[in-house]
């Protein structure tokens, strides 16, 4: 038995870029920063930031492209996937990407482009979009290929206001 699951909460380092593959499916790419802080042996505060390349597909990609913005806080679930490429120096390298299949926008209006503080989850919808497309394959024709229309995204549910948390470091590395 094996498991490949990644859960991240971080801030977008750039606005998402959405492209469309020849078959009409959307692909979205962006980066997310996660940080951890600790005190070293001398009592000095140390921070390390990791950057993660995120890829999303289909309807989730379109939603991310529409609603996520640089600096916004986001919760992501997915899997890690490696890919090999050749660097400018000719050496083969390996990159690791997170293929996200669930997303929740965290924070309020200023964090992303939503209204009051909302939490939006689209993970289950993503799986629903994969299945019908696989079942309804049609022979190729001269007409352009379009993804199957999917049900509307879940309604926004207000998140109750949380009590302020002490000692939060709001330094964003971008």
Swiss-Prot record:
InterPro entries: NA-bd_OB-fold, Primosome_PriB/ssb, ssDNA-bd
A Pfam family annotated for this UniProt entry: SSB
Region described as Disordered: 108-174
Annotated Gene Ontology cellular component terms: nucleoid
GO MF annotation terms: enzyme activator activity; single-stranded DNA binding
Annotated SSB domain residues: 3-107
Alphabetically ordered keywords of this record: DNA damage, DNA recombination, DNA repair, DNA replication, DNA-binding
Disulfide bonds listed in the record: none
Compositional bias ranges of the Polar residues kind: 123-139
One biological process term in Gene Ontology: DNA recombination
Biased composition (Low complexity): 147-165
Highest taxon listed in the record's lineage: Bacteria
Residue window of motif Important for interaction with partner proteins: 169-174
Quaternary state and interactors: Homotetramer.
Its job: Plays an important role in DNA replication, recombination and repair. Binds to ssDNA and to an array of partner proteins to recruit them to their sites of action during DNA metabolism.
Protein name as catalogued: Single-stranded DNA-binding protein
Protein's organism: Neisseria meningitidis serogroup B (strain ATCC BAA-335 / MC58)
């Amino acid at each position: 038995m094996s498991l490949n699951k990644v859960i991240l909460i971080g801030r977008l380092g750039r606005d998402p870029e959405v492209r469309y593959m020849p078959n009409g499916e959307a692909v979205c790419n962006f980066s997310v920063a996660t940080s951890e802080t600790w005190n070293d042996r001398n009592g000095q505060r140390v921070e390390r930031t990791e950057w993660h390349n995120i890829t999303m597909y289909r309807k989730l990609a379109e939603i991310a492209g529409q609603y996520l913005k640089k600096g916004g806080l986001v919760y992501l679930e997915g899997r890690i996937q490696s890919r090999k490429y050749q660097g400018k120096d000719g050496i083969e390298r390996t990159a690791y990407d997170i293929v996200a299949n669930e997303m929740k926008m965290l924070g309020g209006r200023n964090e992303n482009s939503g209204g009051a503080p909302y939490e939006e989850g689209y993970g289950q919808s993503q799986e629903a979009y994969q299945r019908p497309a696989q079942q309804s394959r049609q022979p190729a024709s001269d007409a352009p290929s379009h993804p199957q229309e999917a049900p509307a995204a879940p309604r926004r549910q207000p998140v109750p206001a949380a009590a302020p948390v002490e000692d939060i470091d709001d330094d964003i590395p971008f």
